[in-house]
């Protein structure tokens, strides 16, 4: 399994607009081979930004990399450059190979 994240430093006062960009767009992810799940995460507020992270889980690094070369990726990111004033600098990518997964025990109902 592979986890891909991008960290964004969102300008104060732009949080709602940043979230709207993400929550209203078509991600084109649902039918991509190897895609498992996506989360948009809001982190701590700092003096000059609020930290956000996009977090996607893939069956493998190869599946993630194939998506980055796909038409679905181009469609999902075609307006990305127009949103730059919402955050500071460039998104910071981090990719992780999953070493261990621990899941909750099934609870009786």
Q: What would you call each of these model-derived segments?
A:
Residues 2, 39-48, 78-109:
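Glycine-rich beta-strand-turn "strand-cap" elements at beta-sheet edges
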Residues 2-9, 39-70:
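Short, well-ordered beta-strand segments in beta-rich or mixed alpha/beta enzyme
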Residues 10-19:
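Short, surface-exposed ligand-recognition loops at beta-strand->loop->(often short) alpha-helix junctions
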Residues 14-15, 26-31, 42-45:
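Intrinsically disordered, low-complexity segments enriched in polar/charged residues with Gly/Pro
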Residues 20, 24-36, 57-94:
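An amphipathic, aromatic/His-enriched active-site/gating alpha helix that lines ligand/cofactor pockets
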């Amino acid at each position: 399994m592979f986890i891909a994240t991008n960290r964004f430093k969102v300008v104060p006062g732009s949080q709602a607009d940043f979230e709207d960009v993400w929550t209203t767009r078509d991600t084109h992810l649902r039918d991509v081979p190897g895609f498992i799940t996506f989360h948009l995460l809001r982190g701590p507020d700092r003096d000059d930004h609020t930290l956000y992270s996009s977090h996607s889980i893939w069956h493998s690094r190869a599946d993630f990399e194939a998506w980055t070369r796909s038409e679905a990726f181009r469609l999902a990111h075609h307006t990305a450059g127009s949103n730059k004033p919402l955050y500071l600098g460039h998104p910071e990518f981090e990719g992780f190979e999953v070493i261990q997964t621990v899941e909750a025990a099934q609870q009786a109902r």
